[in-house]
Amino acid sequence: MKNSINRDITVLGFSRVTRSIAAGMINVAFPYYILMTLHYGAFVIGLIYVSATVGTAIFGFFSGIATDVWGKRGTLIIASALLPVSAVIVYFSSSLWTIVPAAMIGGYSATGSLAGGGIGGAVQPIQSAVLAGLAPHEKRTRYFSFFTFLSGVTAAIGALFSKLFDVRDIFMVSAIISAAGVPGLWYLHVAEARGKIGKLKTKSTIGKFTLTGMLNGLSQGLIVPFLIPFFVLVYHVPKSLMSEYAFASGLLGSFAILGAPMLEKYFGFVKSIVVTRGIGTVLFVVFPLLRFLPVAVFIYIIGPALRVMALPIQQSELTKRVDNDEMGRALGINQVARLAASSTGTGLSGYLMDTALFEMPFFIYGVIMAANLYLYIKFFGTRKEELEEEIEVETEVK
């Protein structure tokens, strides 16, 4: 039994690695392809990211339902094939009429740092549901930490690999790499706790995570998709150098995530999020004001790490508080709320940056993150309250 679980985790991990390498390459190449090769402005790339975010939200929502009703394995295979298909489409096209749909099915929403699953697409909630089913309840944070670490490191390597190829060729290379991880998913052994479309028993918990996820997505959409374009438009950083910065940022974020289990042990769910994301928020608010490249690079490298450090704790906490046959829908609904809000932020930032108001998205980001952290405290409370609520939830689920 243990060997079977280890094999399944290895298969899932390999798929995660291939997707992350491809995502890391696309994360660097896509802004340069739109801004420098096709010569469109920040507003256009903002609209593409908005469209991609909406598409990812729609795919994610229906994937979450399919995961619970149809099954995890089949849904995961179909969703995993979307990224290589989208990369092939972009490679063979220079028209926005085909690039936008490709970005939508590939999830080029760039709503997270590389370590946090940027360009994850609709596959993210399904992968999380499968991993939660394979991992022991008490070790889920550790498993989520390791997988997020693995994703971040390989995405950072992918960002560095982007130096080796022409901007357009990166999409074909990414398609080949991401496709390599799809066939093995057929051999996954996943416990299928299939639910029915109906009333959610843990809707209150899902609602709280959905609201905090929505604000988190709005804040992400404001700045994360435009960090690389910011360096392109303000500092005129070449792709070869930007890929090194992206590699360093992704690598640091990945190693920071390994500290999540210890962070959870000493600070608990809420304080871990408030401390790490609070510090990161302050850094991003001052980021556009300094206009000094070394400091900007420093914040670009450590800021995303602080933002995603507590991510495995949040993922684990959500899966602990909902029924197994509602997990796919819970993760899907959470992603829909996050990405729908993110598309609003991305559209606004694209307009502001296109009119040279580079600082405004970061200021708005600070206000929204402050509200988000307040809601985490209000909804989930102190460490003592967390433990009491967890016991309550476990009793209800049993």
Regions found by a protein language model. Give the residues of each.
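Helix-loop boundary and gating motifs at the non-cytosolic
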Residues: 2-57, 207-246
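Hydrophobic core of transmembrane alpha-helices in multi-pass small-molecule transporters
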Residues: 17, 86, 97-122, 295-309
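Central cavity-lining transmembrane alpha-helices of secondary-active solute carriers
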Residues: 47-64, 247-259
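Helix-to-loop junctions at the C-terminal end of transmembrane segments
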Residues: 59-71, 256-269, 353-354
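Structural signature of the two symmetry-related core transmembrane helices
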Residues: 74-89, 271-286, 363-366
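Cytoplasmic helix-loop-helix junction between adjacent transmembrane helices
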Residues: 103-150
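Glycine-rich segments within core transmembrane alpha-helices of 12-TM secondary carriers
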Residues: 141-162, 337-345
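Symmetry-related core transmembrane helices of the 12-TM Major Facilitator Superfamily/SLC fold
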Residues: 169-186, 361-378
